[in-house]
């Protein structure tokens, strides 16, 4: 809504006196804007100090202009009513039509500002004294304030600032290196298992009939028992082989043979080397 239309349709003037001129109201309204003041058709309520409730709908006017003589006007109840009828963002202009001593004026202005702030208004500020009305009545002081641009009970979401987590500088591991970088290509190659022999695998491994891995030759070398050369020319590294089994070690090739003299040929029966089974 523009200022001209606002001044024409939604101005309310209050006074504790029995009479007030329209010129007084229009001159006071010039504090808000000059455009459209001459076409202003305000609503005027006299002897407003006796009212406990204003006969207006809530949020129905844009400007409220109380002009008073008594230092006690407007009361707290009337301030509450003026706040109710003002639209969000509306303006209130309070004028005194009596001259006062400078010290009393400052005290009255401070009291009015405090009363308006407690009543819910914002930006309460003192106005410079100037003539008000057709009779050039001097306005000893005045106070201007605004109603908040939001309605009572309205709510809106607040944008919460997102705090990023604090980054901790940790240099304890700055000297460490990646272990994987120490590996070469040879280290990464999969090891090749040795080829499996053609002999059977089990808890008791032995050479097969057609052994080609050399196991048969190894088994022949470790077979216990005297060879033909040992029987023809018996020798002993320990010197006890010819004394009998009581003096022979566990791996003695002559174990099981009767006592003999070293260097003499040992005679065995024909079935000595034949297996019992």
Curated annotation (Swiss-Prot):
One of its GO terms (biological process) is iron-sulfur cluster assembly. [2Fe-2S] cluster binds at residues 199, 208, 211, 213. The keyword Iron-sulfur applies. Its main location: cytoplasm. The keyword 4Fe-4S applies. A motif (Cx2C motif 1) lies at residues 238-241. Coiled coil: none annotated. GO terms for cellular component: cytoplasm; mitochondrial intermembrane space. A motif (Cx2C motif 2) lies at residues 249-252. Residues 161-188 are annotated as: Linker. Residues 238-252 are annotated as: Fe-S binding site B. It comes from the Eukaryota. InterPro entries: Anamorsin (IPR007785), Anamorsin_N_metazoan (IPR049011), CIAPIN1 (IPR046408), SAM-dependent_MTases_sf (IPR029063). Its cofactor is [2Fe-2S] cluster; [4Fe-4S] cluster. It is found in: Cytoplasm; Mitochondrion intermembrane space. Residues 199-213 are annotated as: Fe-S binding site A. [4Fe-4S] cluster binds at residues 238, 241, 249, 252. Residues 1-160 are annotated as: N-terminal SAM-like domain. One of its GO terms (molecular function) is electron transfer activity. Keywords: 2Fe-2S, 4Fe-4S, Cytoplasm, Iron, Iron-sulfur, Metal-binding, Mitochondrion. The C-terminal domain binds 2 Fe-S clusters but is otherwise mostly in an intrinsically disordered conformation. The N-terminal domain has structural similarity with S-adenosyl-L-methionine-dependent methyltransferases, but does not bind S-adenosyl-L-methionine. It is required for correct assembly of the 2 Fe-S clusters. Component of the cytosolic iron-sulfur (Fe-S) protein assembly (CIA) machinery. Required for the maturation of extramitochondrial Fe-S proteins. Part of an electron transfer chain functioning in an early step of cytosolic Fe-S biogenesis, facilitating the de novo assembly of a [4Fe-4S] cluster on the cytosolic Fe-S scaffold complex. Electrons are transferred from NADPH via a FAD- and FMN-containing diflavin oxidoreductase. Monomer. Belongs to the anamorsin family. This is Anamorsin homolog. It comes from Populus trichocarpa (Western balsam poplar).
């Amino acid at each position: 809504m523009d200022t001209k239309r606002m001044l024409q349709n939604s101005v309310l003037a209050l006074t504790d006196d029995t009479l007030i001129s329209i010129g007084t109201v229009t001159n006071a309204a010039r504090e808000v804007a000059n455009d459209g003041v001459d076409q202003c058709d305000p609503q005027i309520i006299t002897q407003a100090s006796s009212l406990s409730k204003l006969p207006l709908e809530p949020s129905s006017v844009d400007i409220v202009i109380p002009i008073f003589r008594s230092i006690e006007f407007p009361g707290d109840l009337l301030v509450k009513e003026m706040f109710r009828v003002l639209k969000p963002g509306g303006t209130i202009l309070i004028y005194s039509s009596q001259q006062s001593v400078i010290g009393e004026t400052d005290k009255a202005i401070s009291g009015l500002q405090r009363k308006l702030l407690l009543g819910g208004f914002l930006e309460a500020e003192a106005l410079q004294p100037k003539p008000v009305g057709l009779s050039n009545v001097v306005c000893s002081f005045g106070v201007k304030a605004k109603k908040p641009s939001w309605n009572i009970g309205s709510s809106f979401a607040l944008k919460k600032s997102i705090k990023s987590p604090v980054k901790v500088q940790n240099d304890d591991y700055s000297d460490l290196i990646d272990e994987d970088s120490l590996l070469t290509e040879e280290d990464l190659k999969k090891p090749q298992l040795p080829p499996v022999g053609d002999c059977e695998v089990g808890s008791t491994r032995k050479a097969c009939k057609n052994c080609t891995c050399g196991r048969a030759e190894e088994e022949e070398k470790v077979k216990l028992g005297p060879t033909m050369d040992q029987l023809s020319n018996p020798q002993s590294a320990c010197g006890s082989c010819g004394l009998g089994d009581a003096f022979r070690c566990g791996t003695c090739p002559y174990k099981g043979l009767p006592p003999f003299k070293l260097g003499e040929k040992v005679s065995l029966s024909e079935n000595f080397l034949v297996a019992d089974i």
